[in-house]
Amino acid sequence: MREKTSAASETGDNEWYTPPDIVLAARAVLGGIDLDPASSPEANAVIGASRIWTAADDGLARPWAGKVWMNPPYAQPACDRFCARLAREYAEGAVTAACVLVNNATETTWFQEVGGQAAAVCFPRGRLRFWQPGKESAAPLQGQAVLYLGPDPVAFRAEFVKFGIVVTRR
């Protein structure tokens, strides 16, 4: 009998925002952020994307282009759909570079799809501490990965090695 594999239990709350130091490193690698397709005004106060799509906007139904930062909703099927969309938009050239923060669920289809296009991946040491407005920061139940899709894995390594192991393609 085959069992379905899944990541560690989720909190059920998709509104956990990226630690600012990770955002600063991603912004440095990308040279700015044109789009965050899974955001909120509160998160964008740190992200600083030129354009955001919120849950109300339905980022999956909107156009994606340029340099993208993405910390997708971790609940399924949203994470799968956002990662598939990023992989497609990057392969087609609409997205020119991207940094995506996800659980390090390397066994999943969505991780394999977007990870298969990544020029580099950072596996942070320890668990990142996500934040919410008005709440204490918290670490998730499993580790994360930051995947880089773009032309400059050397710059990604230089910025992200301070967070943990960085693996690049040859």
Regions found by a protein language model. Name each.
Residues 1-170:
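Class I S-adenosyl-L-methionine-dependent methyltransferase catalytic core
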